[in-house]
């Protein structure tokens, strides 16, 4: 077996609420898989365009030289989709910064941020905790005077 050069790979994560997606990006031929399945098979089908946004924005040629494998867990369907798209975007930016050049990384970053900032920056909002005196965070139990 011939000796290969050092493996060019980066590992980044994307988060939304309690969903966490970890993306491994390495030199390859344009594969993007989520939990071992291609992007096109991810449910719900209505959110597939959200997953494909980074690819559609940047064009397939930028993804042609890399393979991205994503593991996602936690959260609901929508939160997982947002975590996946963020991890894919961050993985490509990190790969270009480390192994390609700074100019193309900046170009990719500018395109993504101009379209939607959450593609690269996590949404800090979290669920507010429940308090006593009511069924939820802000709602109070009904009060009766008679």
Swiss-Prot record:
Source organism superkingdom: Eukaryota
Keyword Ribosomal protein among record annotations: yes
Matching InterPro entries: Ribosomal_Su5_D2-typ_SF (IPR020568), Ribosomal_uS9 (IPR000754), Ribosomal_uS9_CS (IPR020574), Ribsml_uS5_D2-typ_fold_subgr (IPR014721)
Pfam families: Ribosomal_S9 (PF00380)
Any one GO BP annotation for this protein: maturation of SSU-rRNA from tricistronic rRNA transcript (SSU-rRNA, 5.8S rRNA, LSU-rRNA)
Keywords: Cytoplasm, Ribonucleoprotein, Ribosomal protein
Coarse class of the protein's main subcellular location: cytoplasm
Family stated for the protein in its record: Belongs to the universal ribosomal protein uS9 family.
Subunit record text: Component of the small ribosomal subunit.
Protein's job: Component of the small ribosomal subunit. The ribosome is a large ribonucleoprotein complex responsible for the synthesis of proteins in the cell.
Name of the protein described by the UniProt record: Small ribosomal subunit protein uS9
Gene field: rps16
